[in-house]
Amino acid sequence: MHFSDQDRFFMESAMELAKESFLKDEVPVGAVVVKENKIIGSGRNTVIADNDVSSHAEINALRSASKELNNFRLNGCSIYVTLEPCHMCAKAIVDARLDMLVFAAKEPKTGSICSIDNFLENKALNHSVKYKFGLSEDISANLLKDFFKQKR
């Protein structure tokens, strides 16, 4: 897949947020929402800190972007995430009407884009989101491996 210099920049921004999560003892996932080549929202996993199962990086980034635009619809936006979204996050991405999803590493246990499901390919969805993956995949996968190695 082709990735632009802008894609690399935005994924690196998401990766920095994932590293913050790692340091805060949260699963290291980060996400940024971009509109017109500007980051308008960012988030990292805060499930433990918030005692909230929905506080995934993607959800936090969508909330941040929605506040910035004062609109829950994020048409014309893209989201960069360090890990393949789960079903909850994939549905939120569709409902927010994002144009593009770029993610780094596949998530073989819960990834709903191309690992356990092809959620975005579902013709019944009322909005279509393009996606591509693999940018900084090794960096994300290694960060996750290191995190879970610490836990054992």
Each model region followed by its residue ranges:
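Zinc-dependent deaminase
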Residues: 1-24, 72, 85-152
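Small-residue (primarily alanine) positions within well-ordered alpha-helices
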Residues: 14, 18-21, 31, 41, ...
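Short, basic and Ser/Thr-rich N-terminal targeting/leader segments
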Residues: 25-29, 75
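Short beta-strand scaffold segments in enzyme catalytic cores
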Residues: 29-37
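Short beta->alpha transition motifs characteristic of CBS
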Residues: 40-47
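Residues that line or immediately flank small-molecule/substrate-binding pockets and catalytic motifs
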Residues: 47, 81, 105
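Helix-adjacent hinge/juxtasegments
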Residues: 51-55, 59-92
